[in-house]
Amino acid sequence: MRTGADVTSIKRRLLASAAATAVALIGLPTTPAVADSPGQCTYPNKKYEGRPWALQRVLLDELWKQSTGKGVRVAVIDTGVDTRHPQLRPAVDAGSGRNLLPKNLKDENGNEIERGKENGTTDVVGHGTKVAGIIAARPGKGTGFVGLAPDATIIPIQQNDADGHGTAKTLAQAIDYAVDQKAGVINISQDTANAVEPTPLLKQAVDRALAKEVVIVASAGNDGLGGNVKKTYPASYDGVLAVASSDRNNERAAFSQSGDFVGIAAPGVDIITTVPGGGHCADNGTSFSAPYVAAVAALVKSKHKDWEQEQIVAQLQQTAERSTAGPDRLVGWGVVDPVRALTEDDKPIDKPVAGGGMTNAEAPTPAELHMGETPDERNARLATYVVVGGSVLVAAIAGGAVALRDSRRRSRRSAAGGTT
């Protein structure tokens, strides 16, 4: 059994090693597939009373008149989902959950690691619980936070942990299991990054799911500082909707991975969500942008049960808020617009088209965060870990320059009528 000190140690190790692990060669099935945002919260935490900014940008009443996600099952392949949280307990189908972590796990000192429940409803890391909340947290007393698809059902699949015991092989198994459990949408907020050759085993599992008309949403990755461009998997596979992070101004977040594989963006900065044991905290990363998009996919799938997965993806991209005529390497087709996706839906489309759909809407005034953090704690939470020359660096102030550069690039592209 883990003690409080052990859990704290896990979080510290995850913070220190997540980025370094993500750039390792992960073409082999036995290489860890790490969660791409470590987070920094205490569990449980107090409730967030207001309405988070990522929800303020959406007319929720109008959205939910169209769809609440009822009848759609969303698989969260992650570190587990803690059903002790009152907003998640009614959202999770614990009977369909699965724990794919190896048995008899030990840490570097040979001590046994608590594997968790067999149905995937244990989450000592907190990552999967955060992801699930963004998708389908039920309305709760005393908080303005709620999932974007509040009637969708979560299938908890525990495939990874703080020590990186998840592998490309178990990720492939998790995708197959999700399909067997009738998932309509799969969210994967982690990557197996290999610039040389992706893993055939994982690609085959993705293809099987797509053939069953399952929408697969994956985080693009958090190694975007300094203009770094690399493919991440499974996000880069054909048919997978790769999600970048946007900020409150609908610009690419400084850490967000860019590349031709990026299909869309969603809020990923100061994202309020659920944590193990109850309460909420704020976190950053494409890990939390992906479930935002997965939730909208669930809403569309619930409303249009006969639409193919390719048509659902195209609908999200076509109706996204964008400032250029077509896609770019920063935010794909733009920042997802849930209401437009559910209201400009007279007929399905197979592919998004350039030209129309340029909205460039003014971002809403963000709500203040009242999470009881000290300035030092906030700075630590906002820090982004990147790898340069094999060393892990903390970059907390580079984002402004990167965002300005991206904005200038967009202006030049708009004037020239092209994309990057």
Positions of PLM-derived features:
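Catalytic-core environment of secreted peptidases
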Residues: 103-113, 245-287
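Substrate-binding/access-modulating region of protease and related hydrolase catalytic domains
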Residues: 159-233, 279-284
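C-terminal subdomain of the subtilisin-like protease fold in secreted/lumenal serine endopeptidases
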Residues: 187, 304-401, 416-418
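Cytoplasmic C-terminal tails of single-pass
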Residues: 409-420
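Secretory targeting and sorting signals
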Residues: 1-36, 386-406
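Short helix-loop-beta-strand segments that form the rim/entrance of peptidase-like active sites
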Residues: 78, 144-162, 186, 308-320
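Active-site core segment of subtilase-fold serine proteases
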Residues: 37-151, 180
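Hydrolase catalytic cores
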Residues: 132-135, 268-336
